[in-house]
Amino acid sequence: QNYEISAGGKGLRVTTARLTDIFLEEAERGASCIELVTPGHYTRQIREALLSAKAQGLKLPVVYNSNAYELPETLRMLDGLVDIFLPDLKYFDSRLGEKYSGVSKYFEYASEAIRTMFAMTGPARLGDDGLLKRGMIIRHLVLPWQWRDSCRCLDWIHETFGDDVFVSVMNQYMPIYKACLHPEINRPLTTLEYQKVIRHADEIGITKGFMQVGKTAEAKFIPNFNGDHV
């Protein structure tokens, strides 16, 4: 859904000083957090901007939103600066990562990265307002024909972290961009496929979880990447 910025090269040049200002401006607008989306390739600049913003009074929780295909040493550069991690666990079978995402050893890298994230934040902790203030929400998008792999992802999450993390099981897959190159996923997810995964989450005892209801796989939910406030 985000191919426009992830593969299309769309974006704006921003200096580290301007990024610091953006963080502070978002706080002034009443944002509940600072969310960094797929930020790994700008880690050094983000670290510098966060240090500067926090020195100028930034108090908002910082959220690191990632596909989890990351190196632990990169993540540790932000130790003490990130409060919440939102990693995806896309595949248990790394062959699916090679096929659909063009990356090798996806699960090996992602699982180690997610462990590192947990070590940096510890168990999930909610504030008095009911919002997550520290910890991790691990997200998983169920793909057509891959509900068994989804169940294996949930098994690993629950066996590794128990109730110390939140889990979000998503049904919002949309067959766009290069999905046409893979006929088996060039269709929406069925309700039955999604229900099988949700049922499995319940059976293995996941209690801190989110599920999606209604029609979420629609174009209206794709953000307008127009660079507002940048």
Q: Which residues does each predicted region cover?
A:
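Conserved glycine-rich "GG(E/T)P / GGGxP" loop and the immediately following alpha-helix
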Residues: 27-52, 97-99, 105-106, 115, ...
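Short low-complexity, flexible loop/linker segments enriched in glycine and/or proline
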Residues: 50-51, 78-79, 101-103, 223-228
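Conserved Radical SAM active-site core
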Residues: 1-85, 93-94
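Conserved radical SAM core fold
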Residues: 5-6, 43, 68-71, 89-107, ...
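N-terminal cationic-hydrophobic initiation segments that often serve targeting/anchoring roles
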Residues: 27, 54, 79, 118, ...
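Alpha-helix-loop-beta-strand connector modules within alpha/beta enzyme cores
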Residues: 49-63, 109-120, 189-200
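Anionic-ligand binding region
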Residues: 97-129
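Auxiliary Fe-S-binding modules of radical SAM enzymes
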Residues: 122-230
